């Protein structure tokens, strides 16, 4: 009988283990994990473990001292080229593995170059304070492929929808403009104004291009759900979900435009319950958002609940799970890095939709280099964050083990864990970027130096 008891216990234990394994397998499958679904996941997990041994490896050999501050860094999708957007009209190209200089586009623009975006392994776009966007071909860098005119103020960032081959740009004129790169000529591309809002700072598309996020200097975050870039959004033509604070169920604005705070970025002259007014009946019955429905949020920022803040930097998790914000107080005496998880699902009441974002992690940043925007980024697998921190960068994780976000979501917002700090600059770091293919990080600073970081053993 004793042996039977032991055997029975062993069988029961084995059965529980098998059941547990099945549940873990189902969970991983629902999250898109597995060798067949995400073959690069294990490689990225191994790569992430190497970042604890990362050190400053080299500084790129700059052939010119006329480029000024480095505002943006961008790797080509295959990791073979590192591009620099510089203060003094220049774009610099390097081989990130050898640190060798490839080319300097000395007159890429007529003013500061703000952002670079690769469309594929050979084509990339740049934007500038000269109000233009330029397209370039790596095989022919002696001249621009074409120049795009349409903005009336500084152009600050570029996004690209690979499915439709539409280029999306935003600027301080408050406009988001769509460019059809399928019909580009030397004279430019057909374009249209897609959206307009006041106080626009940054615009991003989620990896699947189902949402557009727009940050503002007034502390609002705008989210366009069920995104359709083929339709221009005129004032009053899109459904508006009431503005609200991310961690609260209370509305931040009235349902009437006459009582909306003056700093609200939304433009709408109609009164009445906006969500009910513009949402289609079919969408109300099904509990789904209509195409291009606009949600206006006031993200919760630690320590800034009673003070306004400016959302200066905006990034998206590579798997679309979360958004990453860099916020500064209106008095410019505090800076925070915050992570907000996307909350999907049908709201309990359509007339009072659930907030799409929830604050999960945060950390206070060094308050140096006031007035300059610091561009932070996710690692390729989304396990880590590289954030400018004074004269260096910090590598941050959701926990000390660098687990994926979905595996360590707290019930209440917690602090990001510092994995490593790297200081190799002599001036304030403004931008940082992970290589998409190699265990390497690049950072650029206000005085124009670019540092590369790699593991050393």
From Swiss-Prot:
<feature type="repeat" description="WD 5">
    <location>
        <begin position="306"/>
        <end position="346"/>
    </location>
</feature>
<dbReference type="InterPro" id="IPR036322">
    <property type="entry name" value="WD40_repeat_dom_sf"/>
</dbReference>
<dbReference type="Pfam" id="PF00400">
    <property type="entry name" value="WD40"/>
</dbReference>
<feature type="repeat" description="WD 1">
    <location>
        <begin position="65"/>
        <end position="104"/>
    </location>
</feature>
<comment type="function">
    <text>May function as a substrate receptor for CUL4-DDB1 E3 ubiquitin-protein ligase complex.</text>
</comment>
<feature type="compositionally biased region" description="Low complexity">
    <location>
        <begin position="246"/>
        <end position="265"/>
    </location>
</feature>
<dbReference type="InterPro" id="IPR039085">
    <property type="entry name" value="DCA10"/>
</dbReference>
<dbReference type="GO" id="GO:0016567">
    <property type="term" value="P:protein ubiquitination"/>
</dbReference>
<feature type="repeat" description="WD 7">
    <location>
        <begin position="424"/>
        <end position="457"/>
    </location>
</feature>
<feature type="repeat" description="WD 6">
    <location>
        <begin position="368"/>
        <end position="406"/>
    </location>
</feature>
<comment type="pathway">
    <text>Protein modification; protein ubiquitination.</text>
</comment>
<feature type="repeat" description="WD 2">
    <location>
        <begin position="108"/>
        <end position="146"/>
    </location>
</feature>
<protein>
    <recommendedName>
        <fullName>DDB1- and CUL4-associated factor 10</fullName>
    </recommendedName>
</protein>
<keyword id="KW-0677">Repeat</keyword>
<keyword id="KW-0853">WD repeat</keyword>
<feature type="repeat" description="WD 3">
    <location>
        <begin position="150"/>
        <end position="189"/>
    </location>
</feature>
<comment type="similarity">
    <text>Belongs to the WD repeat DCAF10 family.</text>
</comment>
<feature type="region of interest" description="Disordered">
    <location>
        <begin position="246"/>
        <end position="304"/>
    </location>
</feature>
<dbReference type="InterPro" id="IPR001680">
    <property type="entry name" value="WD40_rpt"/>
</dbReference>
<dbReference type="InterPro" id="IPR015943">
    <property type="entry name" value="WD40/YVTN_repeat-like_dom_sf"/>
</dbReference>
<feature type="compositionally biased region" description="Polar residues">
    <location>
        <begin position="281"/>
        <end position="292"/>
    </location>
</feature>
<feature type="repeat" description="WD 4">
    <location>
        <begin position="195"/>
        <end position="234"/>
    </location>
</feature>
<keyword id="KW-0833">Ubl conjugation pathway</keyword>
<dbReference type="GO" id="GO:0080008">
    <property type="term" value="C:Cul4-RING E3 ubiquitin ligase complex"/>
</dbReference>
């Amino acid at each position: 009988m004793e042996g039977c008891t032991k055997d029975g216990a062993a069988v029961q234990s084995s059965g529980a283990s098998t059941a547990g394994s099945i549940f873990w397998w189902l969970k991983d499958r629902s999250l898109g994990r597995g060798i067949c679904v995400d073959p690069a996941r294990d490689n990225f997990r191994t790569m992430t473990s190497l970042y604890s041994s990362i050190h400053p490896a080299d500084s790129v050999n700059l052939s010119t001292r006329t480029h000024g501050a480095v505002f943006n860094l961008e790797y080509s999708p295959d990791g073979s080229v590192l591009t620099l957007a510089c203060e003094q009209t220049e774009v610099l190209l390097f081989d990130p593995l050898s640190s060798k200089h490839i080319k300097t586009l000395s007159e890429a623009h007529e003013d500061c170059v703000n952002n670079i975006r690769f469309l594929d392994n050979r084509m990339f776009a740049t934007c500038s304070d000269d109000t233009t966007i330029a397209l370039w071909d790596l095989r022919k860098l002696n001249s621009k492929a074409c120049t795009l005119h349409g903005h009336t103020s500084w152009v600050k960032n570029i996004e690209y929808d690979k499915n439709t081959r539409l280029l999306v740009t935003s600027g301080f004129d408050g406009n988001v403009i769509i460019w059809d790169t399928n019909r580009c000529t030397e004279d430019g591309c057909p374009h249209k104004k897609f959206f307009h809002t006041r106080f626009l700072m940054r615009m991003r598309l989620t990896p699947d291009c189902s949402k557009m996020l727009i940050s503002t200097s007034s502390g609002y975050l705008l989210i366009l759900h069920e995104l359709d870039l083929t339709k221009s959004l005129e004032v009053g033509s899109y459904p508006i979900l009431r503005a609200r604070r991310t961690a609260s169920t209370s509305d931040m604005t009235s349902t009437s435009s006459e009582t909306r705070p003056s700093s609200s970025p939304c433009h709408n002259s109609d009164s009445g319950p906006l969500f009910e007014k513009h949402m289609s009946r079919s969408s109300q019955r099904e509990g789904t958002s209509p195409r291009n429905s606009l949600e206006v949020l006031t993200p919760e920022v630690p320590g800034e609940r009673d003070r306004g803040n400016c959302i200066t930097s905006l990034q998206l998790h590579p798997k679309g799970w979360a958004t990453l914000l860099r916020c500064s107080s209106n008095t410019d005496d505090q800076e925070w890095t915050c992570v907000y998880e996307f909350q999907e699902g049908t709201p309990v009441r359509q007339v009072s939709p659930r907030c799409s974002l929830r604050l999960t992690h945060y950390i206070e940043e060094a308050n140096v280099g006031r007035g300059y925007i610091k561009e932070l980024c996710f690692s390729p697998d989304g396990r880590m964050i590289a954030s400018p921190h004074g004269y260096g960068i910090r590598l941050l994780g959701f926990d000390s083990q660098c687990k994926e976000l979905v595996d360590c979501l707290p019930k209440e917002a917690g602090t990001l864990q510092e994995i490593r700090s790297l200081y190799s600059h002599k001036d304030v770091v403004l931008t940082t970027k992970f290589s998409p293919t190699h265990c390497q990080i690049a950072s650029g600073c206000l005085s124009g130096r670019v540092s590369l970081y790699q593991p050393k053993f």
